[in-house]
Amino acid sequence: MPFPDNLRRHRLGQFLSQAELARRSDLHTLTISRLETGRAKPSSRSVRALADALGITPGELATPEEVAEADKGALPIQRRTRDRAIS
């Protein structure tokens, strides 16, 4: 299953909103949205953060090929601070 669909399936399977998954993974809500719609590719760092937040292994979210492709040209992911996102 492609990463965007897989991420959404796992998130919804745990009845989490994008905002709650963002909070748990320390990623920005916009990053979650972009990953789920395929407008952003997952980096190895974001896959690990999301897997930890969902209580699954990184391999359950993304294939090594998906991560390697994204890591080649990945932009920095947006991390949350208490009040604002930073790069």
Which residue ranges define each predicted feature?
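DNA major-groove recognition helix of helix-turn-helix/homeodomain DNA-binding modules
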Residues: 26, 43-60
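Residue-level detection of the helix-turn-helix DNA-binding "recognition helix"
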Residues: 12, 26, 37-39, 66
